[in-house]
Regions:
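The DNA-recognition helices of helix-turn-helix-type DNA-binding domains
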Residues: 20, 52-53
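Short Lys/Arg-enriched helix C-cap and helix-to-coil transition segments
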Residues: 55-62
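Short alpha-helical "recognition helix" segments of helix-turn-helix
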Residues: 30-35
Length: 62
């Protein structure tokens, strides 16, 4: 499934990750929790995280 994630789903995952970290969850723990919640690998989560940061996805819009 994770290889076919649409952009809206990737943005949802990124937003959930940012929200978890904004709630003072440690980065490593937030990555594990969000990967588990969405059923994706840690590697895929990191790809999505990088994509979101590089493209200024919400909540980091210009």
């Amino acid at each position: 499934m994770e290889h076919n994630l649409s952009e809206p789903v990737r943005k949802e995952i990124f937003s959930a990750l940012v929200e978890a970290q904004d709630q003072d969850m440690p980065v490593a723990e937030s990555r594990r929790e969000i990967a588990r919640r969405f059923g994706i690998s840690d590697e895929m989560l990191r790809v999505i995280e990088r994509e979101g940061l590089d493209n200024h996805w919400p909540p980091f819009e210009d």
